Curated annotation (Swiss-Prot):
One of its GO terms (molecular function) is DNA binding. It comes from the Bacteria. Gene3D superfamilies: 3.30.1360.40, Winged helix-like DNA-binding domain superfamily/Winged helix DNA-binding domain. The keyword DNA-binding applies. Keywords: Amino-acid biosynthesis, Arginine biosynthesis, Cytoplasm, DNA-binding, Repressor, Transcription, Transcription regulation. Disulfide bonds: none annotated. This is Arginine repressor. It is found in: Cytoplasm. The lineage of its organism: Bacteria, Pseudomonadati, Pseudomonadota, Gammaproteobacteria, Pasteurellales. Belongs to the ArgR family. It comes from Actinobacillus pleuropneumoniae serotype 3 (strain JL03). The gene is argR. It holds the Pfam family Arg_repressor_C.
Length: 153
């Protein structure tokens, strides 16, 4: 296992203990596990990367914790696992995704461009608005987008 993979696994294992209330406590714990070159800024980046949040544990202490949801999506995640729902009205399509996946999927949709019938997208954390081009009926684009996510693995 690569050193970075070992660090990631150790980091996640520490957060699952739900006892670290500060980044400096995480730094100290990782250093005790043999990761000498770890510092607060690296821990901060890892907390963001893994979607960790501060929440109260069973003892009512504020601690860092990994989300219970799917976690942060990666480019290797199957797209159909990231899309929760697709719906439309007369003018646009709304795609609901797992938390954190909307911008990744919107980027893919934007790459289809006008030739794919997409004028543009707007993405939040878990929602994407898709506007069709003038020449593409929203129902046709809805079908194309749905097929895209059903056929991707």
């Amino acid at each position: 296992m690569e050193k970075l993979d070992k660090l990631s696994e150790a980091f996640k294992a520490l957060l699952k203990q739900e006892k670290f209330g500060s980044q400096s406590e995480i730094v100290t714990a990782l250093q005790e596990l043999g990761f000498e070159n770890i510092n607060q800024s690296k821990v901060s980046r890892m907390l963001s990367k893994f979607g960790a949040v501060r929440t109260r544990n069973t003892k009512m202490e504020m601690v860092y914790q990994l989300p219970a949801e799917l976690g942060v999506p990666t480019t290797s995640s199957p797209l159909k696992n990231l899309v929760v729902d697709i719906d439309h009205n007369d003018v646009l399509i709304v795609v609901k995704t797992s938390p954190g996946a909307a911008q990744l999927i919107a980027r893919l949709l934007d790459s289809m461009g006008k030739s794919g019938g997409i004028l543009g997208t707007i993405a939040g954390d878990d929602t994407i608005f898709i506007t069709p081009t003038k020449v593409t009926p929203v129902e046709v684009l809805m079908q194309n987008v749905t097929e895209l996510f059903e056929s991707s693995f």
